[in-house]
């Protein structure tokens, strides 16, 4: 009998061609960046397990950077949506929390809040995530602290139905883009950090410099979203640089 988890965390490793891979072996508090993300996710109290899903080109690097107790799923597949569907066959679960591997400040408390909100929804939902004040999914923003929740059966349905290339690359895009087919729940992103002048993802050296400045100021163990918001609120010069980067890379 196959054991089925209630909720599985899946960290999607950035592709080998991404800017993040250039920085992936850099270290924070002695840990490679990808290990750092993995350990923040495993701090969640409501995930039954965590795996990393990587494309074939990135798998060798991922296996050297991901802690040995966290499986890396890198089976060959035509696209990432197909790879996720295959991963869910190997790791059966009722629901998934999807985390981007470049979300350095992914917040385990926000992951747990998301799971609770999805499970306690008045009507059963297929997808839940944080929504930004601009009406877009907050996971698409450069704030970089959010995750998204979905039922495994919704992912399998998307895998069968999605034809557009972008829907095959961005594994949840088909689901949240079709509210007529799936029950969607949006949770308001925290106003304190849902801002145009906040950027906590990493795509270049400027982002890396900001990350180091933040960790130097707050320490590696005090990086919850509230602490980040309070710190950035008193850093107008840093926020101006972040806003400029967000505008330039939009």
What are these regions (language model features)?
Residues 1-21:
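N-terminal nucleotide-binding beta1-loop-alpha1 segment
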Residues 6-11, 34, 49-52:
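Hydrophobic targeting segments
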Residues 57-122:
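Short phosphate-binding loop-to-helix
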Residues 106-198, 209, 213, 230, ...:
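Conserved core of the sugar-phosphate nucleotidyltransferase
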